[in-house]
Swiss-Prot record:
SMART domains: MutH. Disulfide bonds: none annotated. NCBIfam families: mutH_TIGR (TIGR02248), PRK05070.1 (NF003458). It holds the Pfam family MutH. It is found in: Cytoplasm. It comes from Vibrio campbellii (strain ATCC BAA-1116). The keyword Cytoplasm applies. One of its GO terms (molecular function) is DNA binding. This is DNA mismatch repair protein MutH. Its main location: cytoplasm.
Amino acid sequence: MKPEPQSEAELMERAQDIAGLSFAELAEEAGMTVPENLKRDKGWVGQLLEWHLGAPAGSKPQQDFAKLGIELKSIPIGYSGKPLETTFVSVAPLTGVQGLTWETSHVRNKLSRVLWVPVEGEREIPLAERRVGSPLIWSPDQEEEQILKNDWEELMELIVLGKFDQISARHGEALHLRPKAANAKALTEAYSSNGKPIKTLPRGFYLRTQFTEQILLKHYINAQSE
């Protein structure tokens, strides 16, 4: 793996250096094998980018580049230039949630500064031939932060009240909560609405594609006008 970048500028330079290259080219340099598809290797693209950008390994509560305070997110893009899937942010806490605030939450920490790396995501393009796009660095503006905070507080209130059955994909304008488990048997501890311990599927916070699309649009419109 490449050494950890020492500044945001160095990280951006590395991300710009791999823009336009195919997964096959990047995998060859990293000594990695390109899987046939991502069904069993969902995290493969992220691992490939981490190798080239010098991100310390492992999925941790802090950001990928903790020293720089930056989170790395790859984002699969379709022919239309729009994101093809929601973006995982962090696992939702289901116990010990009393007194948690947006300001100290993992979600806010992860989204405070993000290096977005768009990648070709159309399924008909063989994985090896897909290319990395032009990177962008982003922090939520005041309006975006308020939307994220409102969503997080609404969803956490339902968790605190044990209303798991009432949480649906409709909740949240930018952020939504959905089960995150490889299979339906991977249950975790939580509390029901009457305060009794229960087992339920782990949940994860995800950014909606409409929200990430707006981030990309704003950035590329600004870049063109500069």
